[in-house]
A protein has these predicted regions:
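Short beta-strand edge/turn micro-motifs at domain boundaries
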Residues: 39, 43-107
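Glycine-rich active-site loop/strand segments that organize a redox cofactor
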Residues: 155-192
């Protein structure tokens, strides 16, 4: 399966990622390995990955791949509308009397004259993340949830709940958590962030 996928991927220009932690020896799950962040190109778009190497017992002084995880970072020809590609906003301010940003947003949310291209079920972290990513690619996405308010999937849990993993691995695209947030985020703080994220993105 990997060989078949690799043929279609056409990975080229594989190199150590410049703006990540340099290769180092680490302990991962009681396995000592060399860990390296990589970046490369594919025929679909730019990609990144993490490679973990362990000693090869069959070949002295050589290593073999223990873990290889990759992520497609973009799609060539369908770049995200961020940074230099972001919208200017000029079309909202130059013509007085026409619809402004809020008018257009409310019309788009009503779906009275069109259907969404994508329907996402669940306004939790994954649902909001995919909707934000698709939105930045210009793909009309509607998110629905069984709860009345975005964030209620956390808000309605037990009173003392905080996230069980650290803030550093829970960031959402385009709007990372503020740097002064606690390492373990309380449920209501996270719920309110989800609600603000949905409105902003």
């Amino acid at each position: 399966m990997i060989r078949e996928t690799a043929i279609n991927t056409e990975a080229t220009d594989i190199k150590i990622a410049q703006h990540r932690t340099p290769p180092r020896v680490v302990d991962r799950g009681d396995t000592i390995c060399i860990e390296a962040f990589i970046e490369f190109k594919t025929k679909t778009g730019p990609a990144s990955g993490i490679l973990r190497l362990i000693p090869d017992s069959n070949t002295p002084n050589n290593c073999k791949a223990w873990v290889l995880m990759t992520s497609l970072e973009g799609i060539t020809g369908h770049e995200e509308a961020i940074g230099d590609h972001r919208p200017t906003g000029e079309n909202y301010s130059r013509t007085f009397g026409d619809d402004n940003w809020l008018d257009l947003r409310n019309k788009a949310k009503a779906y009275s004259d069109h259907e969404p291209a994508v329907l996402v079920i669940g306004a939790g972290q994954s649902g909001l993340t995919i909707a934000a990513r698709l939105g930045v690619l210009g793909i009309d996405t509607l998110v629905i949830d069984k709860h009345e308010r975005v964030g209620d999937n956390w808000r309605k849990r037990y009173h003392s709940l905080v996230l069980h993993n650290e803030v550093y691995i829970n960031h959402m695209p385009y709007m990372p958590f503020p740097p002064n947030w606690p390492v373990f985020i309380p449920k209501d703080k996270l719920a309110n962030w989800f609600e603000a994220y949905a409105e902003t993105m």
